[in-house]
Amino acid sequence: MVFILKIFRLISVWLLNSEENLFLSDATLSLRENTMKPTTFFITAATAVSILLICCSEQCDLFLTGLVYQNGFYLHENLFVDAADTYGEYAICALFAAVCGIFALKQKFRTLISNKLNFINAKTMLFLCISFFGWCTALPYGFKIFFRRARPYQTDIFAGDCTFTNAFVKSFCPAGDSFISGHTSFAMWLFALALVIPQRIRTPSITAAVGIVLTIAASRILGGYHFLTDVYFAILLTGCGIWATYKTMFIAENCANPPETGTPVSHTTTRLYENKL
């Protein structure tokens, strides 16, 4: 557990201080400080919740899962749970395919694509592909194969055959693939997409993406497919990976080319630069 906490600490330090050696103007520093305030709060809150869930994994997981269990997981066949389980990943795959299709058409028939879709360029596609295949697909399945954690309905506590294990504890359940949640991680690609769409609709898009992710995460718990820690760490780890990639590819580059020091920065220029962040 000490090793895991050290990893969270290193991630926090990197996310906060990776631009420390850049020479920034006063205007840029001010913008950076305003940008970092919510990031600092998020990292502090996420670290605190993570430590709590790691230390109290058994109590939190069994209590919440027990609320939806009564001689079986009675919401397992619920229409909402079944729809999220069956169609959620297909819908995201279709959306990813649509974005790839738009990018391909732009390369061939530029005049046919609306200017509103100009944000789908080579750099954006690279970011979305890294997020889709790396953080949202390879990462969760790597965790599943390594930890082999039993799903709630597979544990002996809930009429299964495998032993319950805490989060980040390697299990030996042959069919165990609970940690971390694949559906939840996959849904986090919507967050990656929301980060690169035009600024004017970015905030509502991020809000919608987070809402969809939380809805899918809730359905995984209600159906007895995952524990609370499975979906929480799926969101946290996948989200950190996506944000670190976005920060490296977009924010760090913008900060590396700020307005020159000593050059008067107009209100319009400041707003344009802030929009890039």
Question: Where do the model's predicted regions map?
Answer:
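Short hydrophobic targeting helices and cationic amphipathic motifs
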Residues: 5, 22-24
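N-terminal transmembrane-helix/juxtamembrane module of multi-pass inner/ER membrane proteins
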Residues: 11, 26-100, 144-149, 156-163
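Membrane-embedded catalytic cores of phosphoryl/pyrophosphoryl-handling enzymes
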Residues: 37-47, 163-277
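Alpha-helical membrane-inserting segments
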Residues: 54, 61, 139, 143, ...
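Hydrophobic, aromatic-rich transmembrane alpha-helices
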Residues: 97-110, 187-196
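Membrane-interfacial segments
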Residues: 108-113, 146-151, 155, 201, ...
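Interfacial segments of alpha-helical transmembrane regions
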Residues: 110-142
